[in-house]
Amino acid sequence: MGGSHIHSPQLDALRVALEEPLDRVQRHPVYAAVTTVEDLRAFMEHHVWAVWDFMNLVKAIQQRYTAISIPWTPRGDATVRRFVNEIVLEEESDEHPVGHGFCSHFELYVGSMAEVHARTDHVSRFVANLAEGLGFEAALALSDCQPAVANFLATTWDAAMAADEELLAAFAFGRETVIPVMFDRILTEAGALGNAGLLRHYLVRHVQLDGDSHSEMAKYLLTVACGDDPLRWARAGVSARRCLEARARLWDAVGDMVGAR
């Protein structure tokens, strides 16, 4: 896809319809409110859950648009397969920035939390429970995460289980469109990143990846999935709005802790 921009009347209309929730997330005061190490810890202890559940969207898309079972057969469009597998490669096994081989972005983020002595026990226990076979809902109920975090995770989970257009809208507008803007604002406005080298790397890496071809390819997938079906576009809009509203509520919760106004 390179740096090309995807255009369709329906996609353009959806962009317009989502301007308010997009603006609320992208202009949220929480980014500039992270001025102390304590603020940064609070931010990361909330945000790490979103880093984890990004992979639910990625893996749901991989399951639907690539062949991951045997006997193997070619599945779908090869360009789409390439895009999806590139995202999986980068998110699940990217190069570690300080020469420690490879790691997922979630593992990198958890490592960055250690740099600022943020708590990781809640999310680590949650992931360990999942690894031991506990279902998502049960693990979430035992996680002790904040209500805004639980709402965010449940919203993403619902999108990952929903129709293709709802999944792809959550990915395209709930993640790939807003992440570069959010992370760029944190990099430029947050005043507490001095000793958080791994976090800075994580943020810069996502601005690079999501701000380039990922966002446009995600919108391309959404456009193909919806076609000219107005009901699919309507469902996509509802899904994207729900995800953006859940993100805004997550940032509201962090803002309440760090004094964002």
Language-model features: locations:
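Non-heme di-metal
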Residues: 2-261
